Amino acid sequence: MAVLFLASMLAIVSAKAETRELPSKKAPLIVETLATGLNQPWSVEALPDGAYLVSEKGGTLRLVRGHHISAPISGVPEVATTGQGGLLDIALAPDFAKSRTLYLTYSARGDGGSGTAVAKAKLSVDGTKLEDTTRIFLMSRLTPRGQHFGSRIAITKDGSLFFGIGDRGESERAQDPRDHAGAILHINPDGSPHADNPFLGSPDGLAEIWSKGHRNPQGLAI
């Protein structure tokens, strides 16, 4: 699965449509171009029907089906595109085939600057819009800095979300348990802290934090 996902990512950003083999001692790798003409694609998520959702850093979400790229999907939250910020990861809820629910990470504006946020939404049946889009999480201590937003999402069997936030360009923040920066966080589908988190109910750290000390986590898998 990881190899196939990597191949898909490489294909999305390829300059021209082609299928080619890459030499490897461990396993055969085939890279197939799925689409061209995307603008800074950041994340690719496969849908049950074989299509792909692709986030573009500038704040656009598109559906790729076959070799066709859709018009921008409406209903995407507004993003802050400062520096490395923008529309980031996409993850489907475990029951997506029935509920059409998905999650997005992105950089959001707020008092003091911007920071990593998580939104929950439903993809319309025709794939043209997000419905009921709601921000369920926004990190603490926003800053005008444009570095290290993270972020990847990994969803567990119970539907809860792990996701990463970078240190926002200030390494000392990754060592502060009262700061969401530089952390892996674990939340429920409604944005509340997960019951297994180490600082839940403690004054020593923020309840959403699962682990600290991460510079800019952009890979996460369960």
Per-region residue spans from a language model:
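Bacterial N-terminal signal peptides
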Residues: A2-A11
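Acidic, Gly/Ser/Thr-rich repeat motifs that build Ca2+-stabilized beta-propeller blades
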Residues: A15-E172, G219-I222
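Beta-propeller blade signature
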Residues: A117-D126, P177-D190
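A structural motif
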Residues: A154-S160, H186-A195
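Short, structured patches in soluble enzyme cores that scaffold and shape functional sites
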Residues: I165-D167, N188, H214
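Short pre-catalytic segments that frame enzyme active sites
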Residues: R168, P189-G205
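Repeat-solenoid scaffold signature
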Residues: G205-I222
